[in-house]
Amino acid sequence: MLSPFFKSISTAAVITFFATSVCASDKMKVVTTFTVLADMAMNVAGDAADVVSITKPGAEIHGYEPTPQDIVRASDADLILWNGMNLELWFEQFFSNMKDVPSAILTNGIIPISISAGSYEGKPNPHAWMGLNNALIYIDNIVMAFSNQDPENASVYKANADAYKQELRATIEPLRAAIARIPEDRRWLVTCEGAFSYLARDFGMKELYLWPMNADQMGTPQQVRAVIDGVKDNDIPVVFCESTVNTAPAEQVARETGAAYGGVLYVDSLSGPDGEVPTYLDLLRVTSQTVAIGLTSASN
């Protein structure tokens, strides 16, 4: 059953949708659930489609609350792209109002890493875009969804995707090499949310985090104590936190262990055009460089 909130925004959307005149456009209109997917999709689309994100730059996407304007925009789309793997729990109810709008789940075909603790234990870690091989699958799924919906431009989407994949590989491989130069016993990634499991796996790093998902309990005394113990036991030199949450728990871990606080990592959301990570490739580059610099500096 829909909540009163979703009933109200659904009604508002229908009224607004039929009352508003929309400028005609030959381009396919694509809506994504968050900015990382939007940037991937824009790179595949080029000039052949218009892509927008429901959530804004810098938004915390796990607990997002859709607005009436969001459902209007999505109702007018030719295609909706979403991540799946329990990331956009808000979107599943949101999308139930738009069964006639084609959609694609971009994690199809990805082998997930399971969450190891908390109320989401055993479920897939949804942050699969943080792994290079997974990102290539996302891009292929976007090409497939675009081509099915807009077959006339299928060759354009394929060519754009091939170029984007080359750019992605060129961005990641030097970063992977920088991490590989760090001594293996120092190659730990300690973060607030367990959102970096795919990055840690691909870079040959061990992982420790305060909480598994931002939708779960965040920064409890028990979580902080467990990570403090883990940092001390493994002589981990640096801890990080991501951009969309309170960094205080990670900073407490650093203070109580003598580890360095290495700064902010990006995962769930891009920044605005003037920010640090306006694109997905920037997000991967800045996050990986921050990790490499933090571990290298702390290890010297």
Residue ranges and their predicted role:
Residues 1-10:
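Bacterial N-terminal signal peptides that target proteins for export
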Residues 19-21:
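N-terminal signal peptide c-region/cleavage motif recognized by signal peptidases
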